[in-house]
């Protein structure tokens, strides 16, 4: 049994309420339930968290070092601004998958750049909340092949 980490950045606590035409009507609790079911079915544990504070995301990334077999991260707006989150992810030794509910490349130009994607093994954007499950399954498969 291994631990996998899913981190969510600013405003994702409003999922299902904020701009549902872009992000959908599912809530972050729905995302967590789906991901817990995937992890448990594969015999793994899951740490799932959300914060509007950059330092908390960084602290959770640091805490995952040596403990988590991989991180799925939706950094929200920090995607486009946070070198600090990138630096924390660069200190994390296991795989990272970046997830975005919307397709950031079809949105405003300032959303097209991601600091996180330079560290991520993969980037999933535009699949709605299903992107989380795709990312988690991929990390579980990577872990299974390396064990």
UniProtKB/Swiss-Prot annotation:
InterPro entries: DHquinase_II (IPR001874), DHquinase_II_CS (IPR018509), DHquinase_II_sf (IPR036441)
Keyword Cell wall biogenesis/degradation: no
EC numbers, comma separated: 4.2.1.10
GO MF term list: 3-dehydroquinate dehydratase activity
Chain residues that bind substrate: 74, 80, 87, 101-102, 111
Matches recorded under Pfam families: DHquinase_II
Broad EC category: lyase
Complex formation: Homododecamer.
PANTHER family found in the cross-reference section: CATABOLIC 3-DEHYDROQUINASE
Protein function: Catalyzes a trans-dehydration via an enolate intermediate.
Protein name: 3-dehydroquinate dehydratase 2
Organism: Agrobacterium fabrum (strain C58 / ATCC 33970)
